[in-house]
A protein has these predicted regions:
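Basic/polar, cationic surfaces and motifs that engage anionic cell-wall
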Residues: 1-8, 15-16, 92, 100-172
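Secretory-pathway/luminal and periplasmic proteins that interact with or process carbohydrate-rich
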Residues: 35, 142-149, 191, 214-215
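Sec/Tat-exported extracytoplasmic proteins
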Residues: 30-32, 65, 122-127, 163, ...
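Short, solvent-exposed alpha-helical surface patches in non-cytosolic proteins
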Residues: 170-218
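Solvent-exposed, acidic/flexible segments
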Residues: 21, 46, 87-90, 104-112, ...
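Exposed alpha-helical structural elements
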Residues: 37-38, 158-162, 179-180
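N-terminal catalytic cores of peptidoglycan-degrading enzymes
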Residues: 1-90
Length: 218
């Protein structure tokens, strides 16, 4: 079993404590930039931005903010699709992982293995269930300004399958079905994650059809 080390780097961009809350979900991001520029940005007080962790393409894991404190990663909310959003600042009850990546969300193998390991650590430490509501993308909090964060190539299917196998659970939905759902969401045909194996209600079919017509400018 590969063991990873977490390197503390710190940042002034955080709020002490969590206002009485505890983490209920992990939010995955991509940096849209490369190291060391991305780290410098998250350590710059003028940026007013940070994350708990930054995973580099070579597999190194950097920690900027303690789990017990509030990182400034998900505070801007617009048209959220995240079902656990309760109307308050999501930073208070989420853990954020940034992945060094210019765009698209494709991770190197070293980066993926580091991310998988870190997800396992956080799931165990904070008793976070493995689900699409508790391991999410930044785009589910801000669908308007962050529609492609962490991107279409982010390995959601592999991540969930590996996490489910690690916990000894079901293998879950086949990856190709998950990919279809994610592509439909990215294209605006649906607004949130849906289980591909659940039957579609009439209202859902109509909603997809109307979204398609809107996309076509009808």
């Amino acid at each position: 079993v590969v063991q990873f080390q977490i390197q503390w780097v710190g940042t002034p961009n955080y709020t002490s404590g969590r206002g009485g809350r505890a983490p209920v979900a992990i939010v995955d991001h991509i940096t849209a930039g490369l190291y060391p520029g991305t780290l410098n940005w998250m350590q710059n007080p003028a940026a007013q931005a940070s994350a708990h962790y930054l995973i580099l393409q070579d597999g190194r894991i950097l920690q900027l903010v303690r789990d017990e404190d509030t990182a400034w990663a998900n505070g801007y909310v617009e048209r959220p699709t995240w079902r656990l959003y309760d109307g308050t600042n999501p930073n208070r009850y989420t853990l954020s992982i940034e992945h060094e990546n210019l765009s698209g969300g494709h991770l190197t193998e070293a980066q993926y293995q580091a991310s998988l390991w870190l997800h396992k650590q956080l799931i165990e430490r904070w008793d976070i269930p493995i689900s699409r509501d508790t391991i999410i993308g930044h785009n589910q909090i801000d669908t308007v300004n962050r529609p492609h964060d962490p991107g279409l190539e982010f390995p959601w299917n592999r991540l969930f399958l590996d996490l489910q196998e690690w916990q000894g659970g079901e293998q879950g939905v086949e990856p190709w079905k998950e990919q279809l759902v994610e592509q439909a969401r990215q294209e605006g045909l649906i607004t949130e994650y849906h289980n591909p194996d659940e039957a579609a209600s009439k209202w859902f079919v109509l909603a997809v059809a109307l979204n398609l017509l809107k996309k076509l400018g009808k």
